[in-house]
Amino acid sequence: MNRKGFTLIELLAVIVLITVITLVAVPSIRYASKKIQEKNYDAKLKMIKASAEDYGNDYKEIIQYNSSTTYTDPNDHQTYPSVEVHVSDLLANGYLVKDADIDRDDILDPRDDSSLKNKSITIYIKNNNAYAVLNFN
C-alpha cells in the first residue's frame, strides 16, 4: 500500500511554520509601511513650505508694507511683517497642485488621509526674503 499524500503531522507542521512566518512578517511590514508614510508626509511638508515661500517672495512687497501682523523669529527674537495663509490659498493660486489620486482640490496627509487644506502657514519677510512656518499640529 503506497499512498502519495501527507500525514496529519506534516500538515500541522506546515501550518505552524506558516503561522510563525506570518507572526514575524506582519509587524515588520506594518513598521515599514509606517516609515514610508512618515517619509511621504515629511516630503509633502517640504513641498508645502517651499510653495509658501514662493508665494511669499511673489507677494513680499504687499506682505512687507501692508501686513498688520508680525512674526517673531525664535532665532534672533526680532519681529518681521507676516501674513497667514492656508494650504487652500496655495492650491487656489497655483502654487500647489492637488493630490492626483483624489477628485477634489485637496492635499492629504499620507499617514491618515486627512485633509491638509485648512492648515495654516505663517509667511514672514526677513532680509527681503520670504520664510514659511507651518502651523501644523
Feature locations, PLM:
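Short, well-structured alpha-helical interface segments that form or flank functional binding sites
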Residues: R3, A43, M47, V85
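Aliphatic-rich helix starts adjacent to a transmembrane/signal segment
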Residues: S28-K49
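N-terminal alpha-helical signal peptides/signal-anchor transmembrane segments
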Residues: K44-I63
